[in-house]
A protein has these predicted regions:
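Sec-dependent N-terminal signal peptides
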Residues: 3-15
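C-terminal outer-membrane/trafficking sorting elements
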Residues: 9, 738-820
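Carbohydrate-recognition beta-sandwich/jelly-roll modules
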Residues: 24-26, 31-334
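Carbohydrate-binding surface patches
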Residues: 119, 581-584, 589, 646-692, ...
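Aromatic-lined carbohydrate-binding/catalytic grooves of carbohydrate-active enzymes
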Residues: 293, 297-449, 454-478
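Glycan-recognition surfaces
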Residues: 404-438, 442, 488-603
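Exposed aromatic-hydrophobic patches
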Residues: 682-686, 714-717, 789-795
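C-terminal beta-strand-rich structural cap/linker in extracellular carbohydrate-active enzymes
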Residues: 711-734
Length: 820
């Protein structure tokens, strides 16, 4: 021990340790030992966790035929040192090992921080000759192929994180007896103890990273590799003609550096993934956004290519008249009207869109004929992307060929591999773009300036994973990898959106880099059905932590009655879908509320017939989006619900059932039942959601309005098949500064009659509701409601009726409705 202390003292003072001696770096629960035989062992809590760790690089010298590879297991180090350091994360000490093959040197660094519970690994390669440029597309910052048991737990699983949200992929979970490669970050966790291992890249400026993990017997690490330079079919780097993976681009310079990788063991794997995301955000801050969750409506849920301006206006008006006063608006009292694909220049003219933004949806007054009208004070959205479609190769790029700007076609801006266009999917129509080509900048500048003139404040950018592909070369010679090109292109979009005060939501997009958008779709396209909701929650089960990277996670448009589904969705199915929005972040409706939206073709339907089911959707929307308690949560909070137990799944890709979110005033718990046939019964331990029983004032279920009686250590739930329950636990001691403020200035009531059912929703609790015809005769009545919503059967003729609601506080509210 005295010898070891002397060696460590030498390391800290002189910087370099004798290569014949053991070098040991300790900090907190960590120990890193570089033995005298050059083996590297990582211990955690006194247990060997990773043995025979190594680094490896391949390289070539630009302008020469020289190339090589260096592996720390096969070359003796020229120096080993322990040095103090300070970076964006904090200060600490690092073990640095240098290896040289006579042409280039590899520096392997493992850093431990004074105040961080993890290790950071990086590898750097540089030429031994001054002035030479070195290039690498394969840098392993940390690896092992030696079996070692994880420090805790005997029933581990591992999480595979998808590269992007395209192709209907999912987060996947495997027994820890297989091998997988996760994208950018991987996690191994024990479902019983929650102990976890997390490894992931915290730099996303140059590299695509692959995290390869192989386990055995659910407790042994057999292989671990943290690779800068990973490409595959799933990163959309694939040549469909030759059936080969396209290699990663080269990082080059006086030296080439890998990404930095966080490596950590955590008592709770969920804390580990959150810590990983927070570390990324410390290094590269996310795009700032203080506007809260977007709440609104999108044309893509149902209207799609049949969209037209009268239908959009009627839908927006219905939302304003019937849902706004029930709290369906964002924290700034606005809703979004998002015009998706097939709007600009297809179903709607530029002039019509401009009229929407500058007049109909504005926050001021405008003239329509002799009338002065008040705008709806809504935010208008439009749809764009970073992609090239194969039918546009010869088409002129808008924004080029004007003034002194050169003319370009979309084919000019293609990113090519082996001289050919790079298609992201076999037989697919969309192709990779070179975001560094001037045509892209000119097009974005032209497009967003037009949108700004139309008062666009919300932009959905789709297929932007087309900008992160690898290729032969880029227009800008300083760009040499797909990630570098993506950052270049997204910065153009972000800077323009910032200039025009626009919210950016990414649709089909890589998860990393993240700093160029305020929101991102957490998964691929989904609409109304129960299985689609389970798919959305798969992304929250294993990817809720991405709310540290994006201000808003987006669950796609929330559809109640999908076109062509013949109103087959149950109310439980609708509640599940709406709750996926609550648990994720954004709250965007997808239904049509207008009979002016008609089919523009006869492809599977009658041309000219009304699209979908507007009247049925209105009735359901009042039930689902007229719930003031649900709306209040979405309006006043950002961030995603966290899984309570990630080990409750029954399949490799399935979502969890129970999620929670802690706010200053409440703890929210959502319990999903994705089974169509069997009720789900159980209980939630207060300990599992982080609240003391003595701090619970009331438990209310928000969909039924019922008050739940808790037990000493838990509360029970019973969720019908294909349904969901959301419990709100009010705290006795709430955070004063952040208590939710109800922005509704006065109670309000909205109602709709659809078929033989009347739905009444209010922003405050109702005691009873009566329905009157215009003669004053009561045709229906319901008492003892004690909830913000009432649904009752009616048998009435077409015509106008009056709803009269007796509120819980004794006041009365009325609304006029029409039975059609």
């Amino acid at each position: 021990m005295k010898i070891r202390n002397l060696i460590l003292t030498m390391a800290l003072t002189a910087g370099t340790v004798s290569l014949m001696a053991e070098t040991k770096l300790e900090q907190g629960r960590w120990s890193i030992v570089n033995a005298d035989d050059n083996t590297l062992t990582i211990s955690f809590d006194g247990k060997e966790a990773i043995k025979n760790a190594y680094a490896e690089v391949t390289y070539r010298i630009a302008g020469t035929e020289a190339s090589g590879s260096i592996n720390s297991m096969t070359v003796s180090p020229s120096s080993v040192s322990i040095v103090p350091f300070e970076d964006e994360i904090g200060s600490g000490r690092a073990l640095t090992r240098v290896y040289d093959d006579g042409r280039a040197s590899m520096t392997h660094t493992l850093s431990l921080y004074d105040k961080a519970p993890y290790m950071i690994a990086r590898v750097v390669v540089a030429s031994d000759n001054d002035g030479e440029v070195i290039e690498s597309n394969h840098m392993v910052a940390f690896a092992t192929e030696t079996r070692c048991q994880l420090p805790e737990g005997t029933s581990h699983r591992m999480i595979k994180v998808p590269f992007d949200n395209d192709g209907h992929g999912r987060y996947e979970v495997y027994d820890f007896s297989n091998e997988m490669t996760s994208h950018e970050v991987g996690c191994v966790f024990d479902a019983t103890t929650k102990f976890g291992f997390v490894a992931g890249s915290v730099d996303h400026d140059k590299w695509k990273s692959g995290i390869t993990i192989k386990g055995s017997y659910k407790r042994f690490i057999e292989k671990l590799e943290l690779l800068s330079g990973y490409t595959s079919q799933l990163t959309r780097d694939y040549d469909w003609e030759t059936k080969t993976v396209i290699p990663h681009g080269y990082v080059k310079g006086a030296k080439a550096e890998s990404a930095r990788y966080l490596i950590g063991f955590f008592d709770d794997w969920r804390v580990g993934l959150e810590t990983f995301a927070e570390t990324c955000a410390t290094i590269t801050p996310p795009a700032p956004w203080d506007g809260g969750n977007p709440m609104g409506w999108s044309t893509w849920g149902v209207m799609m290519n049949h969209v037209n301006t009268p239908a959009v206006k009627e839908t927006a008006q219905w939302i304003k008249d019937n849902l706004f006063d029930l709290g369906f608006h964002d924290k700034n009292d606005q809703t979004v009207i998002s015009l998706d694909s097939f709007c600009d220049g297809w179903g709607m003219t530029s002039s019509e869109i401009s009229q929407l933004g500058n007049r109909f949806l504005s926050d001021g007054t405008y003239k329509e004929g002799l009338q002065t009208k008040q705008g709806l004070n809504m935010r208008l959205g439009l749809y764009g992307g970073m992609v090239i479609w194969d039918w546009t190769f010869n088409g002129s790029v808008p924004g080029t060929g004007i003034r002194d700007i050169p003319s370009y076609t979309w084919g000019d801006a293609l990113l090519r591999y082996n001289g050919k266009e790079h298609r992201l999917f076999e037989g697919g129509q969309y192709c990779a773009i070179d975001p560094t080509h001037p045509a892209f900048y000119y097009n974005m500048d032209y497009t967003l300036s037009r949108w700004a003139a139309w008062k666009i404040k919300y932009i959905k950018m789709d297929f932007i994973n087309s900008g992160i592909c690898e290729g032969d070369s880029w227009y800008n010679p300083e760009i040499t990898t797909g990630v570098m090109a993506y950052n270049y292109g997204m910065k153009i979009i972000y800077d323009l959106a910032k200039k025009y005060d626009m919210y950016i939501v990414e649709s089909m997009a890589p998860l990393f880099p993240y700093q160029w958008a305020h929101g991102r779709r957490s998964c691929c396209d989904r609409f109304s059905e129960l299985g689609e909701s389970e798919y959305v929650m798969n992304a929250m089960t294993w990817g809720w932590w991405t709310d540290r990277l994006y201000a808003v996670n987006d669950p796609d448009q929330l559809v109640l009655h999908k076109d062509g589904h013949n109103k087959g969705e149950t109310e439980g199915e609708n509640r599940v879908r709406v709750t996926t929005g609550m648990c994720t972040g954004a709250f965007i409706i997808g239904d049509s509320f207008s009979d002016k939206c008609v089919y523009v073709d006869d492809n599977g339907h009658a041309k000219g017939a009304v699209v979908a089911y507007p009247e049925a959707s209105k009735a359901r929307a009042l039930k689902m989006f007229g719930n003031a308690d649900i709306n209040a949560y979405v309006r006043e909070n950002t961030g995603s619900f966290r899984p309570v137990d990630g080990g409750s799944y029954t399949g490799s890709q399935q979502a969890a059932y129970v999620y929670m979110r802690d706010t200053p005033q409440y703890v929210y718990v959502a319990v999903f039942n994705f089974s169509k046939y069997i009720a789900r019964n159980g209980s939630v331990l207060y300990e599992s959601i982080g609240i003391e029983p003595s701090n619970i004032k009331e438990i209310k279920e928000l969909w039924t309005g019922e008050t739940v009686s808790g037990k000493a250590e838990s509360f029970d739930y019973s969720v019908p098949a294909g349904d969901v329950r959301v419990f709100r636990l009010a705290k006795v001691v709430a955070g004063v500064d952040d208590i939710v403020v109800d922005r509704t200035s006065r109670p309000s009531v909205s109602a709709v009659i659809a078929g033989n059912e009347c739905v009444v929703s209010s922003s405050a609790e109702m005691a009873s509701v009566a329905l009157y015809d215009l003669s004053g005769r009561c045709v229906a009545r319901v008492d003892d409601i004690n909830h913000v919503q009432a649904v009752f059967d009616v048998n009435v003729q077409k015509g106008v009726y009056i709803v009269n609601a007796l509120m819980a506080d004794g006041s009365r509210l009325s609304a006029k409705i029409t039975a059609r």
